[in-house]
Amino acid sequence: MSGHSKWNNIQHRKGAQDKKRAKLFTKFGRELTIAAKEGGGDPNFNPRLRLAIEKAKAGNMPKDILERAIKKGSGELEGVDFTEMRYEGYGPAGTAFIVEAVTDNKNRTASEMRMTFTRKDGNLGADGAVSWMFKKKGVITVKAEGIDADEFMMAALEAGAEDVTEDDGYFEVTTEYTEFQTVLENLKNAGYQYEEAEISMIPENTVEITDLETAKKVMALYDALEDLDDSQNVYSNFDIPDEILEQLD
């Protein structure tokens, strides 16, 4: 990933696959439940829940399913007791991986993570094994079409952004993770609509993958981790050039 934009391209590729296998609603539902459990069921007083609702609606999640997920988190309906977990490990060519998961059975999820890393030429590490290689940041992506670049960059910085870049038809706004919700709300109030908005783990340095076979192995691990039922987000520090990445589709 040269820069976060290429990482977004990989995530978009996975996003299309997620929709085909209908896993996206499960991810939305768990995030809604966790967000409601953490901060209550009223999105007016719970920024994380507000963002989760926006994403679920954008992904065409049925309203009744969305509302049930929130009520399970707020305690209005009986539901599974989910816990957020993080797993860290190494993949092929020394690549680092972080998996954020939501689980109702820590032992099951840990076993599945360990098995997946092992089967795909990787190793599951201890807590903190690779997280020091990443920084937790807010990332907001806005389509650049029809927007004056100078005006947007000024608006984003005034909104509290840490950095703004433009690449491949999109503006990418980076924030301190503690300022993410504030910057997002400020941009929306200024009239800008986001394409994606999330708290992400950004690698401080990347591992460049220059041959197709190694790229296949790295992406095989990435895909396998994404496919696990309890996985919510998968981050890594690999950098696969576009010309090689295109051969993997």
Swiss-Prot record:
A Pfam family: TACO1_YebC_N
Keyword field contains Cytoplasm: yes
One GO term (biological process): regulation of DNA-templated transcription
Compartment annotation: Cytoplasm
Keyword Transmembrane helix in annotation: no
Gene Ontology CC entries for this record: cytosol
Alphabetized InterPro entries for the sequence: Integrase-like_N, TACO1_YebC-like_2nd/3rd_dom, TACO1_YebC_N, Transcrip_reg_TACO1-like, Transcrip_reg_TACO1-like_dom3, YebC-like
Biased composition annotated in UniProt, kind: Polar residues: 1-10
Entry keyword set: Cytoplasm, DNA-binding, Transcription, Transcription regulation
Region (Disordered): 1-20
Family, as annotated: Belongs to the TACO1 family.
Protein name: Probable transcriptional regulatory protein FN1661
Lineage, top ranks: Bacteria, Fusobacteriati, Fusobacteriota, Fusobacteriia, Fusobacteriales
